[in-house]
Design a protein with these regions (language model features):
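Residue-level preference for beta-strand/loop junctions
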Residues: 15, 40, 72, 86-88
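Acidic, metal-coordinating catalytic segment for phosphate/diphosphate chemistry
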Residues: 1-20
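Conserved Nudix-box catalytic region and its N-terminal flanking loop in Nudix hydrolases
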Residues: 25-65, 69
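A short coil-to-beta-strand element that immediately follows conserved catalytic motifs
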Residues: 70-78
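Active-site-adjacent beta-strand/loop module that shapes the phosphate/pyrophosphate-binding cleft
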Residues: 80-102, 114, 129, 133, ...
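Conserved hydrophobic "DFG−1" position in protein kinase catalytic cores
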Residues: 23-24, 32, 94, 115
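Nudix hydrolase/Nudix homology domain
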Residues: 39-42, 108-156
């Protein structure tokens, strides 16, 4: 019989968890947002998961805040473990759930939101990683396959 781990000894996640959305339009262009402050990098819409918030709710909130779009969240497409930042980013497929697929900026953190057919040079490390994994031949980056399995309810 296994002994329960004493409450004070239980593991607590130490990594910051972020979520990002891979949203394509009919022409297979991908929705990118440009940061308004700092290095003003292009990145995929998304952000940090708040304490007690599900991954799906966090992604819906972040995309809505940054672009004005309401989305339906699909499969997990990839994971980026940023050991240098003690952070992990999860990439999900998503589609706009409203009739219009035009992105509108709702937050002052984002300067611009637009569908792009290629990744701009001034892109965030996570955007470069996921773009390369989704769009490049296998020799440049490991291919990320969309999961056919649903995430455990505890993660949602």
């Amino acid at each position: 019989m296994r002994k329960a781990i004493p409450r004070a000894s239980r593991l607590r996640p130490t990594k910051e968890v972020s979520v990002m959305a891979w949203i394509e339009d009919a022409a297979s262009s991908v929705l990118l947002v440009r940061q308004a402050a700092g290095l003003k990098l292009w990145t995929l819409p998304g952000g940090k998961v708040k304490k007690g918030e599900s991954l799906v709710k966090a992604l819906k909130r972040e995309v809505r805040e940054e672009t004005g779009l309401r989305i339906q969240v699909g499969s997990l497409l990839g994971v980026l473990d940023r050991r240098d930042k003690d952070a992990i980013t999860l990439l999900f497929a998503a589609i706009p759930s409203q009739a219009s697929n035009k992105a509108k900026r709702k937050q002052n953190e984002i300067k611009k939101a637009t569908f792009q057919s290629s990744l701009p040079n001034k892109a965030s490390p996570s955007a470069k990683y996921f773009w390369s994994a989704r769009r490049s031949p296998v020799k440049k980056a490991p291919k990320i396959r969309a999961s056919t399995h649903q995430l455990p309810t505890a993660l949602l």
